[in-house]
């Protein structure tokens, strides 16, 4: 009771004062049973292969392949975090429009990965370019580096396609 004799109302329940998060993807391990969860897993696997292959080629053209490494490693880590947020169920506790965040994330990564794929393809196409190093003409990429870069280009394309499929699914969820 207050000093005036009127009863004091109970404090509001915080669970009732916050709106529910907007997400149509399931939380927990059920995310892995959806197409979106499967694509995120493929993005992680193929994206990891891209940066491992680029790193194993000893990065002969750092100006081009440095961006490919940055994009592939950043997307790999962010996709792991994205999947971890859904697997842990945090999406049900944070009030956010997760459908829009899913769309915005996949749109951004798709654009950057498409650029990285083009740069990796450009690097691979320089295989026959010869450079003059003190009177000895050598190819810019050795045969081993060329083969590794071909594989990295293929996996960069596959990863870009996976991000594109995830983008399409996210767009359908965000704009029904």
UniProtKB/Swiss-Prot annotation:
Residues 31-175 form the MARVEL domain. It is a multi-pass membrane protein. Residues 1-34, 88-102, 171-176 are cytoplasmic. GO terms for cellular component: apical plasma membrane; membrane. Keywords: Cell membrane, Glycoprotein, Membrane, Transmembrane, Transmembrane helix. It is found in: Cell membrane; Apical cell membrane. It holds the Pfam family MARVEL. Residues 56-66, 124-149 are lumenal. Belongs to the MAL family. Interacts with TPD52L2. Member of the machinery of polarized transport. Required for the indirect transcytotic route at the step of the egress of the transcytosing cargo from perinuclear endosomes in order for it to travel to the apical surface via a raft-dependent pathway. This is Protein MAL2. It comes from Bos taurus (Bovine).
């Amino acid at each position: 009771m207050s000093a005036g004799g009127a009863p004091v109302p109970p404090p509001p329940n915080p669970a009732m004062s916050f709106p529910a998060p907007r997400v149509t993807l399931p939380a927990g391990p059920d995310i892995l049973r959806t197409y979106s969860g499967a694509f995120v897993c493929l993005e992680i696997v193929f994206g990891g292969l891209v940066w491992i292959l680029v790193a194993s080629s000893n990065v002969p053209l750092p100006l081009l392949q440095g961006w490919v490494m940055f994009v592939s490693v950043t997307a790999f880590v962010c996709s792991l975090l994205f999947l971890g947020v859904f697997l842990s169920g945090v999406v049900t506790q944070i009030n956010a429009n997760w459908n829009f965040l899913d769309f915005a994330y996949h749109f951004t990564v798709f654009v950057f990965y498409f650029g990285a794929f083009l740069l990796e393809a450009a690097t691979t196409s320089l295989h026959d370019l010869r450079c003059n190093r003190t009177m000895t003409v050598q190819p810019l990429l050795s045969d081993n580096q060329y083969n590794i870069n071909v594989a990295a280009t293929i996996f960069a394309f596959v990863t870009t396609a996976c991000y594109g499929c995830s983008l399409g699914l996210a767009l359908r969820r965000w704009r029904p």
